[in-house]
A protein has these predicted regions:
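Conserved functional acidic sites
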Residues: 1-177
Length: 177
């Protein structure tokens, strides 16, 4: 809904699970409006990623299609109902890695600064096709955990050469009526 927003704080999590808040990395995401693409209405989502450190503010176009969050190209980035299919496959063509999006960890309880939620994880999983990574084995899992009627409450990613993960945790949000 136009006017809804979410604010995330970022944490560094070491291999033992200890987390450290980074006060210099905060993101906000909001619904700026909607637009028609083809014959479908999409929400315009605007925000920053990791405090803008990796990219300028982004603009996504998303819509709800029978419980799935989809892009204008039809890619599913989240599903509230389909826990078996692979939604997206990424292949850079280098023969070393590939990735895919899949719903995992259904019903996992997640605690973030704003509260505790039962979540669905629209994980992006990168697979090492030629060996293992020192900290992850063959799978590098990037979490995108969503709570019903809230949106994304936790996201995580890591760099291949590091045993630390970076986590965005929901600090506050507002869902416009």
């Amino acid at each position: 809904t136009v006017g809804s927003y979410w604010v995330y704080d970022w944490y560094t999590v070491d291999s033992a699970g200890n987390s450290t808040w980074d006060p210099n990395q905060t993101d906000s995401v909001y619904i700026a409006g909607d637009t028609i693409i083809g014959t479908d209405t999409f929400a315009i989502q605007v925000g920053t990623w990791f405090g803008g450190a990796f990219s300028p503010p982004f603009r996504n176009y998303l819509r709800n299609l029978n419980g799935d969050l989809v892009t204008p190209s039809g890619s599913i980035i989240f599903s509230a109902t389909n826990y078996t299919d692979t939604f997206y496959i990424w292949n850079p063509g280098n023969g070393q890695t590939m990735g895919y999006r899949k719903m995992i960890d259904i019903g996992e309880i997640v605690t973030v600064p704003v509260g505790t939620f039962r979540t669905l994880n629209a994980a992006f999983i990168v697979v090492n096709l030629v060996g293992t990574w020192s900290c992850f084995g063959i799978y590098d899992i990037h979490d995108n955990q969503y709570a019903e009627n809230i949106g994304m409450v936790r996201t995580s990613f890591q760099f291949i050469g590091s045993c630390q993960a970076l986590e965005g945790r929901l600090r506050t949000y507002y869902i416009a009526p």
